[in-house]
């Protein structure tokens, strides 16, 4: 009987390992540029995720969004902050989303493309560098505060992105006075006076799943287990 039990345990363990190995990692196009970051530690964090990725920087990044080049990827991970985007690149970006390519917008990528109105519809929100209009009234530019303690609350415990996540604290850069569309699905919130009400949400654009996660400024966030888990599950879900 003992031999049978040992054999069954070995079989189950072997089957589990084979299943894990056979599950291909999510193939990610990782885009940066327009904002500096601690490359060594950020890339070390990415290596912990169930992904394989190619890294491209601006000004060459938009070329990778063309249909014949983006096809090989499951998800685009934005950690860039360019100011402008050419009309042709806008068309490629939208065409990519209309075909269902997953998109994860991380931290300062929330602050990109001030002059492109469609970007707020894609992301479901925007960090405004300049005064902006809401309900007919002028709003002040958005703000940022480094090294801010944020108490984060899980708004939807059943969503795949927040599965296994409980409320947590994180030291990160806070974004205040931002625009968030009422049509997004809230996942993580905070009541910090220095930050907008949400730090993570999902949106739909075209046929694509879009995730916005405003956390992730530096190693204080990148080493936070809750942040790593949320980012990992966001990429998998967006696929």
Positions of PLM-derived features:
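Extracellular ligand-binding/catalytic regions of CAZymes and related secreted enzymes
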Residues: 23-26, 194-196, 204-239
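Short, solvent-exposed loop/turn elements at domain surfaces
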Residues: 36-41, 86-87, 195-198, 220-224
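Catalytic beta-strand/loop cores that center a nucleophilic Ser/Cys/Thr
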Residues: 40, 44, 49, 140-209
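Short, solvent-exposed loop/turn segments at secondary-structure junctions
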Residues: 35-36, 83, 110-111, 192-194, ...
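Sec-dependent signal peptide recognition
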Residues: 2-10
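C-terminal motif of bacterial Sec signal peptides marking the signal peptidase cleavage site
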Residues: 18-19
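Helical hinge/lid and interdomain linker segments adjacent to catalytic or ligand-binding clefts
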Residues: 27-31, 37-113
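A glycine-rich, often tryptophan-bearing local segment used as a flexible ligand/cofactor-contacting loop or short
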Residues: 83-160
């Amino acid at each position: 009987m003992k031999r049978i039990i040992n054999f069954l345990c070995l079989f189950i363990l072997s089957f589990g390992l084979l299943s894990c190995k056979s599950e291909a990692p999510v193939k990610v196009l990782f885009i940066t540029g327009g904002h500096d970051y601690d490359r060594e530690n950020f890339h070390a964090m990415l290596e912990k995720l169930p992904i394989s990725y190619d890294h491209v920087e601006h000004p060459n990044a938009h070329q990778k969004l063309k249909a014949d080049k983006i096809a090989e990827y499951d998800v685009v991970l934005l950690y860039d902050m360019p100011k402008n985007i050419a009309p042709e690149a806008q068309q490629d970006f939208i065409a990519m989303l209309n075909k269902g390519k997953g998109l994860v917008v991380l931290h300062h990528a929330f602050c990109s493309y001030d002059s492109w109105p469609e970007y707020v519809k894609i992301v479901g929100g925007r960090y405004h560098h300049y005064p902006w209009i809401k309900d007919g009234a002028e709003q002040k530019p958005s703000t940022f505060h480094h090294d801010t303690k944020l108490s984060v609350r899980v708004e939807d415990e059943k969503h795949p992105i927040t599965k296994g996540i409980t409320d947590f604290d994180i030291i990160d850069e806070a974004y205040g006075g931002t625009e968030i569309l009422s049509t997004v699905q809230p996942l993580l919130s905070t009541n910090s006076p220095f930050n907008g009400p949400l730090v993570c949400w999902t949106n739909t654009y075209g046929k694509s799943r879009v995730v916005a996660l405003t956390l992730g400024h530096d190693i204080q966030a990148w080493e936070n287990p809750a942040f790593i888990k949320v980012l990992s599950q966001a990429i998998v879900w967006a696929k």
